Amino acid sequence: MKKAYYGDFGGQFLPESAMFALNELEGAFLKFSKDKLFKKELNELLKTYVGRPTPLYFARNLSKKYQHEIYLKREDLNHTGAHKINNAIAQALLAKKMGKKKIIAETGAGQHGLATATAAALLGLECEIYMGATDVQRQALNVYKMELLGAKIHAVQSGLKTLKEATTAAIQAWVGDIKNIFYVVGSAVGPYPYPKMVMHFQSIIGKECKMQLQKLNKKVDYIIAAVGGGSNAAGIFYDFIKDENVKLIGIEAGGLGIDTPYHAATLNKGKTGIIHGMKTKVLQDDLGNILPVHSVSAGLDYPGIGPLHAFLFESKRAQYHAISDEECMQALKLLCKEEGIIAAIESSHALAFLEKLCPTLKKKSVIVVNLSGRGDKDMQMIRDYKKGVIYG
């Protein structure tokens, strides 16, 4: 595997002016990811500030319903409410070690923006967040939290006003002041070394999960995670990739149906192309124009995918399925009623696949679902969905 690629996917497709910053970032990442003092400081923050390790919870009522052993990796219990803080606090700490004073980030559901603003406040860094205007509207609570933490919010008005446009705006701002700004990428996407770096910082999810299963003397058969850009899935998948006995399943946003134009099922419906500095699978037309996407989830409506997932899809090491808005919302309500847990809409896509997977299994299986975030941020969206309001 070439340094910057996963199979045919990855690379660095940005202007020459960005190469200095990417090389500088790669050097700093390779240095500090092996530095004992950096690792000690980061691990202490993850333990005492973020709240790791997160539990691997046996969902007894779901297990009874589906007649399989269902476990939830509780990333929703992290400080700020999702897996995003694992990566954001690590990159912010790296930025500080590099002498940067200002960090910026893109965000869709607001969880990465919130995590980045939180890390910036803790570490004394200036912070600006780029967010599509549509997402600013549907994730108003997270916007207010970010502002309360001292971050400046840029509501991006171009295109569909969602995650793709926010990412484009953040890249433009970064390239415009590349010596002073550190861009905290929120998912396992973008030009190298970002996909590798984000996966490295999120891999703590899978490492913990593997140790927790060993303590329970359980062998996992299936791991299910929602996929937008792909950081939570990459985080829980990575330590299991070499174990062919473990089936890895990523769940994309099926929106109103993958046979309609209203979805974000990049691997199921996309083609190989270039987006945001990487070669990957992209939802695009025959002329290479990026197609509009839709999902009830602000965190999954992205027309690209991290290069690791494109590689796992092409190599058939992982399966990728789509779950519709309606299936997702039914799963969200089911978890509330069965386990007393309000999951994020993103995570509920992964939960919904249990309804499809479990009836097909011939033997009792151990299934882990990565519960990537909690649903506090989604209360208005859930109410609006019931009223028939459609965003994106």
UniProtKB/Swiss-Prot annotation:
Function: The beta subunit is responsible for the synthesis of L-tryptophan from indole and L-serine.
N6-(pyridoxal phosphate)lysine modification, residue list: K84
Full protein name: Tryptophan synthase beta chain
An example Gene Ontology molecular-function term: tryptophan synthase activity
EC number: 4.2.1.20
An annotated GO cellular component: cytoplasm
Family affiliation: Belongs to the TrpB family.
Annotated keywords: Amino-acid biosynthesis, Aromatic amino acid biosynthesis, Lyase, Pyridoxal phosphate, Tryptophan biosynthesis
